[in-house]
């Protein structure tokens, strides 16, 4: 095999796309900062037990593992940043009130999340700790929508769900972890026949409720149908009320509901959302509430957040126009160097053409050039 061939679903990012990704990263972090979110940078490599805390088998399977040559302990390359940020909130910051944190960095997956997905996403996310009320859920959802608006994602649509509905239906039913994961997969796939087989020994009320979830997706009428089809358990009633309130606060956004949506990692404990947009084969953003994610670090407090892949975001945005640049000759003349430095100080891109070469760039369009005229260097159109 040729030395330049990369592993499957791993790719180099070339100049024009790399610049686009960097500009999106800056815009997303600046938007989060406007909401009061502080930037943190957790390490790419960490002890395995810290990375996989409370996250379930899905994250375990997605994590690359290796042995630390210094300590002999198992380590992992992060597949998701949320457990790390929870550790920072619980153990390092340990603040008494609300904490707002954001991050942006690479994660690594053993398998791609979708047929054409990268195994090295650039994950951006924001998380709010310390408030159990719906105000935090709404803030994180509005921040996610504003992030997409800032980078000019057209007409995003929000899909709402709540993990507590399924948890309430399964409460009191002896379900092993493997069976629970099969049930979650059948619900996500809307596979009623498989779900019927998996739940055939369940109590009738739980079984009928789970089977009803397969059909409970669509517009706001779904919530009314759910009130009739599901048991009037307190957790279910509260979840449906919360979803209705959240939807009512999203003025102008297209909102739908999918009460069987359990995709993502196992740490979600309450309301959850996915945001879709034209041109994307999967959700651009996933988020929700995960109140127990920091428990293993000694601080079990409310938390909500979201994440997205900046690389995937680039794929649904129109191609950027090339940046206008100025072409300049390479000479030892001091006045030329002064002219070039002055233009760069003004924010202009000046590309020096080295002797014997033409300038070849993917990211810039040289529409002007620096030429000598009457003893001065001036910018002229090409």
Curated annotation (Swiss-Prot):
GO cellular component: cytoplasm
Lineage of the species this protein comes from: Bacteria, Pseudomonadati, Pseudomonadota, Betaproteobacteria, Burkholderiales
Keyword Amino-acid biosynthesis among record annotations: yes
Record's subunit section: Heteromultimer composed of HisG and HisZ subunits.
Further details from the record: This function is generally fulfilled by the C-terminal part of HisG, which is missing in some bacteria such as this one.
Pfam families documented for this protein: tRNA-synt_His
Protein name: ATP phosphoribosyltransferase regulatory subunit
Keyword ATP-binding belongs to the record: no
GO molecular function term, any single one: histidine-tRNA ligase activity
Organism of derivation: Albidiferax ferrireducens (strain ATCC BAA-621 / DSM 15236 / T118) (Rhodoferax ferrireducens)
Keyword terms: Amino-acid biosynthesis, Cytoplasm, Histidine biosynthesis
Coiled coil: none
Pathway: Amino-acid biosynthesis; L-histidine biosynthesis; L-histidine from 5-phospho-alpha-D-ribose 1-diphosphate: step 1/9
CDD domains: HisRS-like_core
Signal peptide start-end: none
Record-stated family: Belongs to the class-II aminoacyl-tRNA synthetase family. HisZ subfamily.
Known function: Required for the first step of histidine biosynthesis. May allow the feedback regulation of ATP phosphoribosyltransferase activity by histidine.
Compartment(s): Cytoplasm
GO BP term (any one): histidyl-tRNA aminoacylation
